[in-house]
Amino acid sequence: MQNVGPTEPSKSQVFRCPAAGCKAVYRKEGKLRDHMAGHSEQKLWKCGKKDCGKMFARKRQIQKHMKRHLTLKKHSCPTAGCKMTFSTKKSLSRHKLYKHGDAVPLKCSVPGCKRSFRKKRALRIHVSEHSNEPLSVCDVPGCGWKSTSAAKLAAHHRRHGGYRCSYEDCQTVSPTWTALQTHLKKHPLELQCAACKKPFKKASALRRHKATHAKNPLQLPCPRQDCDKIFSTVFNLTHHLRKVHLCLQTHRCPHSNCTRSFAMRESLVRHLVVHDPERKKLKLKFGRRPSKFLGRGTRCPTPVVEEDLSHLFSRKLLFHYKTRLETNLSGLFNERQLREPAEPEVNLSGLFQLPQGRPKAEKAA
């Protein structure tokens, strides 16, 4: 089983390098795997050229290498007998310095030691011999490979014997790391919490379980004043409010012989297994919202809404400060100010210009 330690839940998940003394942090797990390959010297990336076949530990290394195949190597070494060609002048000058010139050697910094080396790895191994650090030596006959890291030795051993399956009952040895990953998918995934040794079949269930072992777990208290219940998930808090305080058990069992009702739809789906034992796999879709556009003739179910929910909440939590009442609200409106105070008009006929009617003709006597 794979032991996965508890981690604190966070909104933005980060992946930290577990190597000692390394503080690298990445947002994507693939970036971390690429970085860890540099620590363990696992060369997972292979050049696809027919005549090349070089292996690299990191993705950016093979990307840089592939550019060499695409670019023309115009700069050739002028030394007699050397047929090396390079794409840049800088690479050519480095080649002439270390291969044919007098390159500055890497000298040992230990007092009294006059050894010098051309590669940094050889210098690190030599310095570890002065400090009496334990060296990891390859035990394959005729190899004699040395390293100061046990992880690098394990990566070196895989070059001799391939990549062995980590399961105890499986003796499969894959020639490449990619073939090993393909083989591991055939084994059933078994995850185990490192804190309580509880097994899980899904990685999502293990992540939710690890939140219970966090140093600062999420605490959601019940908003009612006379209730001291505290929950770790929003689902449990919602279930508590609907069942205990609101008594909203609207999800009834459809079977005629069963009178059970539940506050949450997920609880009803789990209950249906009692009536149908052959139904083993449940695919619950949490947080599913109804479609915005319904078909013709369909009606959206009317939600049960309680009018007065004030008894569920504490007023101290809702109102952190006293409200201020504004008595003079005249400053909020942009009204035209009158120069002189208006007087009430009794006769308003002078404000209107009404057409005068023609005088009626008098009847002749």
Swiss-Prot record:
One of its GO terms (molecular function) is RNA binding. Coiled coil: none annotated. It comes from the Eukaryota. SMART domains: ZnF_C2H2. InterPro entries: TFIIIA_Zfn-C2H2, Zinc_finger_trans_reg, Znf_C2H2_sf, Znf_C2H2_type. The keyword Metal-binding applies. A zinc finger (C2H2-type) spans 15-39, 45-69, 75-100, 106-130, 136-160, 163-187, 191-213, 220-245, 251-275. Keywords: Metal-binding, Repeat, RNA-binding, Zinc, Zinc-finger. p43 is a 5S RNA binding protein which is a major constituent of oocytes and comprises part of a 42S ribonucleoprotein storage particle. PANTHER family: SI:DKEY-208K4.2 PROTEIN (PTHR46179:SF28), ZINC FINGER PROTEIN (PTHR46179). The 42S RNP particle comprises four subunits each of which contains one molecule of 5S RNA, three molecules of tRNA, two molecules of p50 (EF1-alpha) and one molecule of the 5S RNA binding protein 43. This is P43 5S RNA-binding protein.
